Amino acid sequence: MQYSFRLAELLGHVPDPRKRPGTIKAIVEYTGLDRHQVAALLKNEVKYIPLKALSRLCDFLIEHGHATPDQLPGALFAVEPENFWELLARRKRLEMCVGVRKDDNPDSEVSFVAASDSVLLGELLNGVTTLGGTAKLRKPVEAVSALASEELPQPEHLKQSLVWSPGQADEDEVMRRAKTVHERFSDSKGDKALVGIGSTKSNPVVEIILSRSFNCNAFESQDEVATPNERALPFFLRYRDNDPHPPSCMAGLKLSKSDTGTKEGLYYEDANGKWIRCGSGKSGEEVAFVFYLHRESQGRLEMCMGGFSGKATRLLARALGTRAQDFWPPAYASQGMQIGAFIVEFTMPAGKKETDILRTDLVATAEVTVIPHEAIARRLEKR
């Protein structure tokens, strides 16, 4: 069992170089701790803490109204997840966001969620509440102690958010609504998770999650960078020519300014800086992605996932239900962050049935590629 130090969460501290709230200075002056030690505590990067220092931190939290005496020191520690589903289930507040489309009738108040996104959302709920179907295996036959009878991790609050898919409202309104959802999540207190379902083609909150994760501008294309290695993200969705093409840090029509031959699909950068296309684009092959960033010291998780097509999204839902272990552990762990980024390639068996569009139990061979630590580190550690 592993624990994280949640000082940043109790203080509501977000390490943003553009904002300097004076948190570290205030703690240093009150406790007498070293500035670098406080910074490391806020990032959950300290392996041990003296009892005297822990006592002074508790005094600081009580005096400044961040916690009560009966909550400390326990509130400063949290059990860390040991698999993909625990990563979500251990959050106290879980928010899931999907993109919606309007009815063609301008007077209608009806809006639609893509069937594939609904299937993926349902699988997420199932996995979180049953720990991927393993919850019954973890319950003790007889509760011989209070510890043994401890309840399984599960969110205390579930929330759903709806945003306009690109093209379903004025561009400014699409961005405004997505930013509002993300800001409300960021401003909420306590341990929390936000999951954006779909790609940037259908869910603009996914764009915001990815842009904030890699410190670049949302809703701005990177197709004109000099070389592919200058892209802010280590993976790229090349739109179909007949797709909507909303400006995106993750997606576009070419890897770089000089690129002329990029084919539709998902690409990622390998450990050596080479860009690899996933799948051949042939009939019967589908591709999807999963990304998450966990700031353990803040108790904050942001995640997004989706397929290149509706079928790919439904296949991803099935993969989560049967192979969630392939999305753990995160490939990158540094600077108080854990990041997992994965591309999933599906190969369907030969033959197609007309009812495939309604099936949620599609069978396909799945190959999960982990986007390597080096590709992520090159972008985060040069900031």
Region spans (language model):
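DNA-binding alpha-helical recognition surfaces that contact promoter or target DNA
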Residues: 9, 40, 59
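DNA major-groove recognition helix of helix-turn-helix/homeodomain DNA-binding modules
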Residues: 50-71
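Solvent-exposed alpha-helical segments and adjacent loops
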Residues: 82-383
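A short, Lys/Arg-rich alpha-helix, primarily the initiator
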Residues: 1-26, 30
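Residue at a beta-strand N-cap/secondary-structure junction
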Residues: 21, 48-51
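The DNA-recognition helices of helix-turn-helix-type DNA-binding domains
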Residues: 45-46, 64, 79
